[in-house]
Amino acid sequence: ILRCLVGSEMCIRDSAEIAHIEVRRRDLRWPIPDDLEQHLAGHRIMRLWRRAKYILIELSNGAIWMIHLGMSGRMIVEPSGHNEPSKRTAPHVHVVAETTRGDVVLYQDARRFGSMDWISNDQLESHPRMANLGIEPLSEALAGPWLIKRLAGKVAPMKAALLDQRLIAGLGNIYVCEALNRARISPFREAGSLKPAEAKRLAAEIRATLQEAIDAGGSSLRDYVRTDGELGYFQHAWRVYGREGEACSCGKKGVIERAAQSGRSTFYCPACQR
C-alpha cells in the first residue's frame, strides 16, 4: 500500500495539498476524532512512511495522519485524470479526501476494524499506539544476535513471540508462517531455544519473505487490494500458508499441516520444521 501511495503513478504526489476531507462514518475500531478534518484540510503533504502496520502522512502544519487498515480496510487512490468510474459511491467508503491537484483518496472498510487519527509530529513516539512498538522487520537491527538476546529465556511458542508487536513491529500471521517454514523452524518450539545459526537464518528469511511480498504487491485473500484496485500476487508464492494437505517443498516428503495457535491458523511442515 505505502509503495503505491508514494512511488507509482497512482500516488498522492508529494507537496499536494489536501483540499477537502469528508468523514462519512466515525465509528471505526476507535472513533475518528471530530477535529480530524480541520487538522488535515488546507495543508500540504510533506512525507509518507510506515511504522509497523500504520500508514503515516505528515502535513505542512506538523500534523500526522495515522491510518491502520485493520482486517478489511483499503486505501484506493484515484489520480487526477482518472478515467474509470469513481468508487467514492461504493459501499463502505467511510472517508474521502481530495487534493488540490485532483487526486482522490478513499478509505473503504467493510468490517470497520481499521482506525484513523491525527497527532502532532512531536508527539508521535509517545502516542499510545506507537510507544511500545518493536523494531522494524526490514531494518538492519533485525539480526541473529539481536533475536538471541531478545528471545532469551522466553518459553512462549516461537510463532507467538514473532507476532508480538512489542518485539518486531509489523509482522503478521501469513508472513510469520512463511518465514518460519523457510528457516526450517517449528512454530511450536520455545522462542528462547533458538541457536545462533538458526537465529541468523530466521532474521534473513523474515526480511526476504517480506521483500518478496512487497515486490509482488502483497497477498490478496478476501479483502486486500492495492491502491489501484488490483490484486497482489504473493499468495501464489506461499509455501505453507493455506496449503494444508499439500506436499512441502522441502524434499523430505513432508505434508503441510494446520493447527490453531492463539486463535489463529498456523501452517507448517512437521518434517522439516524443528
Predicted regions: what is each one?
Residues 32-50, 57:
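Active-site-flanking structural segment that lines cofactor/substrate pockets
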Residues 1-7, 12:
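Single conserved hydrophobic/aromatic residue that forms the stacking wall/gate
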Residues 19-35, 49, 146-274:
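Basic, nucleic-acid-binding surfaces and adjacent catalytic neighborhoods in DNA/RNA-processing proteins
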Residues 47-51, 87-90, 240:
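A short catalytic or substrate-binding loop motif that flags glycine-/basic-rich loops and adjacent residues
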Residues 20-22, 47-49, 55-58, 64-70, ...:
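Short, conserved beta-strand segments within well-ordered enzyme catalytic domains
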